[in-house]
């Protein structure tokens, strides 16, 4: 009997090794975390300390290097390369593309950290070394969420877009992107190892984002509806909502994703406009935002290369290096999506568009929400921070 037509295409076959090995390890880890929470937390803390204290400089070098590489690619002849055929036209309108670009890097944690990240720095000795909370507490949030993080995404997005739309590779795997370097070894152990590491990185990023989203939503529900909701119940609710959104996106493809992205943009910027116009801190938000942005640009290279070699505060190890590692983890997923939706656009448009939509929207979010809460704290209108703030 001829079974030729029953065989699945190569890119649609299930890779059981990549599926079962991470699943097994995750189940084992979950059991260990549940049975030995204190010991597990101690081990994870030691691993994080080792990576930040011993290998932290490499994260900083890679972060700055990738950002500079993105600028070079966008301004060089390689920026003219079209991600697609010679006469390929963009698949999505400029607004739809930009909305999906921004929401590719948007999660619940941006709402949490836009509003409150300055609180985490307020009592840090490093801020006192630099100057005052007023001057520096709102600078680092912008730095940690803007140019270098999106540089990680956009360099890889250009590479993946070239792989998908120019080389016409259908397997959206990290190993496939490494085929020019690995050659025949892509389909062997080396390629499998790369894909396994990518899966573990994606799981780690998802877990981190999920751990931030759950308490944020619990607090919001408690404040809005005065209902104390158990974290386990909230987790189930989030999973159900996630399944609904995923199913909608699956049934409607990128058209559905585009619709959800635009709806998210309208809601998000509607919130920002409401806070700016009716929050009572418009003047403070604008003036402090301009000052913070200018200070970040003026001191960009110093912020990007500060290592605290004597460990007087360990600020870069605790924060900057942690963030760079966090963004690197999400490079497993976001660049593939950005590269996919950028079909028909040039490499230059992809990179600069990412900085315009992604970085621009992120900075606006941190300026409005962060300076709103900081202004309320400094004026005494609200006790948001864990410690009193001084000018």
Please identify what each model-predicted range represents.
Residues 1-133, 273:
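N-terminal alpha-helical transmembrane segments of multi-pass membrane transport
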Residues 4-11, 39-51, 71-89, 138-144, ...:
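Membrane-water interface regions at transmembrane-helix termini and the short interhelical loops
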Residues 8-18, 52-56, 86-104, 136-148, ...:
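Transmembrane-helix boundary/entry motifs in multi-pass membrane transporters
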Residues 21-35, 60-68, 225-251, 270, ...:
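Transmembrane alpha-helical segments of multi-pass small-molecule transport proteins
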Residues 28-40, 63-80, 207-224, 236, ...:
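Hydrophobic alpha-helical segments and their helix-loop junctions in multi-pass secondary transporters
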Residues 34, 38, 102-123, 150-167, ...:
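Hydrophobic transmembrane alpha-helices that form the core helical bundles
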Residues 100-109, 152-156, 199-207, 235-250, ...:
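Selective recognition of specific alpha-helical transmembrane segments in multi-pass small-molecule
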Residues 383-391:
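Residue-level detector of conserved catalytic or cofactor/ligand-binding positions
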């Amino acid at each position: 009997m001829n079974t030729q037509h029953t065989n699945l295409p190569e890119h649609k076959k299930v890779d059981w090794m990549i599926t079962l090995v991470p699943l097994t390890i995750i189940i084992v880890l979950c059991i260990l975390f549940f049975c030995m929470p204190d010991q597990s937390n101690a081990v994870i803390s030691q691993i994080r300390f080792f990576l930040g204290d011993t290998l932290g400089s490499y994260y900083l070098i890679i972060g700055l290097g990738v950002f500079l590489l993105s600028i070079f690619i966008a301004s060089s002849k390689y920026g003219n390369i079209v991600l697609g055929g010679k006469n390929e036209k963009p698949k999505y309108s400029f607004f739809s593309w930009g909305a999906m670009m921004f929401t590719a890097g948007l999660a619940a944690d941006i709402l949490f950290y836009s509003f409150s990240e300055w609180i985490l720095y307020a009592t840090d000795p490093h801020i006192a070394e630099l100057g005052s909370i007023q001057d520096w507490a709102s600078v680092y949030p912008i730095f940690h969420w803007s140019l270098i993080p999106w540089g990680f995404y956009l360099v890889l997005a250009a590479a993946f877009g070239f792989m998908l739309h120019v080389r016409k590779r259908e397997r959206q795997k990290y190993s496939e992107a490494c085929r020019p370097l690995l050659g025949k070894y892509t389909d062997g152990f080396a390629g499998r190892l790369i894909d396994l590491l990518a899966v573990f990185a994606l799981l780690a990023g998802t877990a981190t984002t999920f751990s931030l989203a759950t308490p944020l939503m619990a607090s919001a529900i408690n404040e809005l509806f005065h209902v104390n909701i158990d974290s386990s119940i909230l987790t189930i609710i989030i999973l159900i909502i996630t399944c609904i959104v995923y199913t909608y996106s699956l049934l409607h493809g990128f058209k559905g994703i585009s619709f959800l992205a635009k709806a998210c943009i309208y809601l998000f910027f509607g919130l920002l406009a409401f806070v700016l116009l009716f929050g009572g801190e418009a003047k403070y938000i604008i003036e402090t935002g301009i000052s913070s942005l200018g200070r970040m640009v003026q001191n960009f290279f110093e912020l990007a290369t500060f290592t605290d070699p004597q460990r007087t505060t360990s600020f870069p190890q605790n924060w900057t290096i942690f963030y760079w590692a966090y963004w690197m983890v999400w490079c497993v997923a976001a660049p593939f999506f950005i590269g996919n939706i950028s079909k028909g656009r040039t490499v230059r448009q992809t990179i600069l568009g990412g900085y315009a939509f992604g970085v621009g929207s992120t900075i606006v979010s941190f300026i409005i929400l962060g300076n709103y809460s900081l202004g309320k704290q400094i004026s005494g209108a609200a006790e948001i921070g864990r410690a009193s703030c001084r000018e």
